[in-house]
Amino acid sequence: MNTKYALVTGATAGIGLDIAKELASQGKNIILTARREDRLSEISISLKDEFNIECDYVVADLAQFSAPDKIYNFCSENNYIVEILVNNAGYSINKKFHETSEDEEEKFLR
């Protein structure tokens, strides 16, 4: 069965988590993605129980070049149709620019 989903990146905290909850409250099925499997699992169970929706997750670090393919393959293998994409994942450096290393700057730009 092909079921429509909203895919939310950076879904374990902050704006991403709030958006996932709001979409779930509207009856949307959700695919969560972030780096922390423990939080993804907890949130997935919570959204299913509270809003009676389908919810799944894929662990992915969008700073890695392979992450989009991993997410795409996960959705494809499970026959999930992504009808809404919330590209929320982000990375910040809590330093002044002149104090950052080249590695930190490269990670930030990805």
Predicted features along the sequence, with ranges:
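Conserved glycine-rich cofactor-binding loop
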Residues: 5, 12-14
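Residues forming the Rossmann-fold NAD(P)(H) cofactor-binding site
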Residues: 17-21
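The beta1-alpha1 cofactor-binding region of Rossmann-like NAD(H)/NADP(H)-dependent oxidoreductases
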Residues: 38, 59-70, 102
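Hydrophobic/aromatic anchor residues within beta-strands of the central parallel beta-sheet
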Residues: 55-57
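Conserved catalytic-site loops of classical short-chain dehydrogenases/reductases
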Residues: 83-84
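Conserved NAD(P)H cofactor-binding loop of Rossmann-fold oxidoreductase domains
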Residues: 88-93
